[in-house]
Amino acid sequence: MKSLIIGDCHGEAPDIPEEGFDLILCAGDICGGTDEMRNKMFEAMDTEKEWYELFGEEEAKEAVKSSIQEGKEIFDELDSLGVPVFIVPGNWGWTGENSDWEFLEGRGYPEMLEEFDNLHDLNFDCIEEKGWNFIGYGPCSGPEIPQYEDDKPESEEEMDDIQRDYEDKKQRLQKLFTCEKTVFLSHNVPHDTSLDKIDNEDSPVHGRHYGSVIVREMIEEFSPEYSVAGHMHEGKGRETLGDTECLNTGLNSVW
């Protein structure tokens, strides 16, 4: 079985061959986004406002519509290839997770996949294809449990909520790892590897690791044959953890 692997397109269509593979794996962040949107999202982390309030709600709605449309155009190209496409959402999938913005309801992921016959949502699911089991885990922009003191919330209540969410996600995934010959498709890479290290010397978190704790724990507990992920654009490449070959697809890459 030959797989085509796509990572973090961010609205830019990748250079996809027309044949030579049996299925496609997509690690999320297919939809686009502007620098201004990203800046407001980072800015909102230090305020009590949502990013779209800082951006201007009507302008934000138009920006999200444009982002989703860019994603759908790429999905349409993938769908036209006539092979199964397994996808997990990234943090640019407009899932509405961790957001009360009613505008997103029914617009983003996974609803945006419904018009395509060959696209399959793998988030917290297991699908068997050609003798292999594909397990998916979607949005995750950093360690599910904060690993650095300045990332930890101020209140015990917030930390308790984080812990409960982490335990819930971990247990949901553990129930899926029941078979051999497994490919684990996640948005974020395993924590504390060469694949998740912040190498940008201008970054305030230079040298830190912001991969997924849960992805690492699933690899250590179940040893899937392959771990495929993206999100961390800097860490493009491969690393082996135990018996698992791990791949960081990098930015707008095809493997």
Give residue ranges: language-model regions.
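Well-ordered alpha-helical segments embedded in enzymatic catalytic cores
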Residues: 73, 168-169, 214
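Conserved catalytic scaffold of divalent metal-dependent phosphoesterases
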Residues: 9-11, 30-35, 93-208, 250
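Conserved beta-sheet core of the metallophosphoesterase superfamily
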Residues: 84-88, 194-255
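Divalent metal-coordination and catalytic microenvironments
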Residues: 8, 24, 29, 90, ...
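Active-site-proximal segments of metal-dependent phosphoesterases and phosphodiesterases across multiple
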Residues: 44-64, 68, 180-223
